[in-house]
Amino acid sequence: MSVASRIRTQPVGSSAIRGDPYSVFVIKEGYAYPDRDGNTKADGSITLLKGRQAVLVDTGNPWDKGVILQGLGGHGLEPEDVSFVVCTHGHSDHVGNLNLFPQATVIVSYDVCRRDVYLSHDFRAGLPFKIDDGVEVFATPGHCGSDVSVLVRGTEEGTVVVAGDLFEREDDEGSWQPLSENPELQAKHRDRVRSLADVIIPGHGAPFRVIKEREPAL
């Protein structure tokens, strides 16, 4: 009998997801909401992957320096302990404070560099960039032209994807499209990530579970 899958979501309810070899810690939960003046208040999520190496995914706005230092310090880390910094895309609420990590390998969208040396890697061909066993960066464009996400295997929740603004938040259906440079492409990669992930960490909201239910097709 053929089956069809149905997906629902559920808040994780925690900023810490333990794992082996890597645990995932949201050290700042992103947000975005309109203010009284018709503008938008927003800042991106900042996520630490801690295992054999320390990996920081997105670095917030320029004024998030204190948040980053405090978040790292809470895990016994200093900026010089961070081996990789991944910025999922180039918007200002995701790339602030890169100057804190001059020793790290930095990935911003499809660029991979160590100081002034740009490493050859073809994200456009669909090749993931392996940081370590169980941790890789892969292309998820649509919100911008060259977004990336980070996949972490082996956590207590299963596979976690730190997705940047591929997902604004858990309940973003109908609101992400006006922010997208290519909604059709973004929708494709949203579906792909939902099929891969047990938990998604969005760019502007709390982590949420992706629950795949299979039921007989009529």
Name what the model sees in each region.
Residues 37, 42-43, 60-130:
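Active-site HxH/HxHxD metal-binding segment of metal-dependent hydrolases
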Residues 7-11, 70, 100, 104-144, 146-218, ...:
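Metallo-beta-lactamase
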Residues 26, 47-50, 126-155:
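Core dinuclear metal-dependent hydrolase active-site scaffold
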Residues 32-38, 62-64, 83-85, 137-141, ...:
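Short, flexible loop segments at the rims of nucleotide/cofactor-binding pockets, characterized by
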Residues 57-60, 81-91, 107-110, 139-142, ...:
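Active-site neighborhood of phospho(di)ester-bond hydrolases with catalytic His/Asp-centered motifs
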Residues 1-52, 188-199, 209-218:
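Zn-dependent metallo-beta-lactamase
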Residues 53-54, 159:
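Residues that mark the start of a beta-strand
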